[in-house]
Amino acid sequence: MAEPNPRRSARPRIVVVFYSATGNVAALAEALGEGARGEGAEVRVRPVVERAPAEAIEGNRRWKEWVENNPYETTASLDDLEWADGIALGSPTRFGGAAEQLKAFLDTTGGLWAQGKLASKVGTSFTSASTEHGGLETTIAAMNNVYYHWGTLIMPLGYAADPSLMSSGNPYGASWVSKKSSAPDDDALVAARVQGARLAQVAAKIAD
C-alpha cells in the first residue's frame, strides 16, 4: 500500500521569479501571483538581483527610477525554487531571449538540478517587449528551455483557459508590448492572472 503524501490537500506553493528593468515585468509578476492566490496558493513573488553597471542604469531614466524605488526587499533564492510546487519565470526580451540578470540566477541552479529537486514541478513563463515583434515568443521559449533540463513540466497559458485570451492573450505566456514605455494594460494583466490561476490549479494536482 502506498505511503500517504504529507503534502496532499495542502495549498500549492507558487514562486514567481523575474527580472524587471522598469516595472512592466514586475506588474505582470504581481498579477500572476494574484491569480495564483485566488486559487488558494501560497505565493512568493521574487525579483532577481540587478547586475547591470551603474553607468548603464544612469543612462535610462525609467530604469534608474525602478532601481531606486522598486518595492521589493527580498530577492529570489534557490530555497524559493526548492520550496515551490509551481514556478513562473519572467523577463523582458533581450534580443529574443531572457535578460542576463535572470539567466545569471538560473545558472546557479545546478546543485538543485543534480539532486533532482526541480524535477516534476510545474513551470510557466511570461515576458514584455518594447516592439510588437521584439521576441515575445522566443523569449518565453528560451526560458522554457531551462525547464526541459530541470525535468520540470511546462505549462503554457494556452487559449482555452479563458475566452478573453483569444483576442488579447499570447498562448505561450502572458506578455505585454510596451509602446512608448507604457505600463501593462488590463488585458495583459488579466492574461497574467489567468496564467497564475492555471499554474496553481495544475501545481496542486502535481503536488498531490
PLM segments and residue spans:
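N-terminal beta1-alpha1-beta2 submodule of the flavodoxin-like/Rossmannoid cofactor-binding fold
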Residues: 1-117, 176-208
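Short, glycine-/small-residue-rich phosphate/pyrophosphate-handling segment
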Residues: 119-167
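A charged, well-structured terminal subsegment
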Residues: 148-173, 178, 182-190, 199
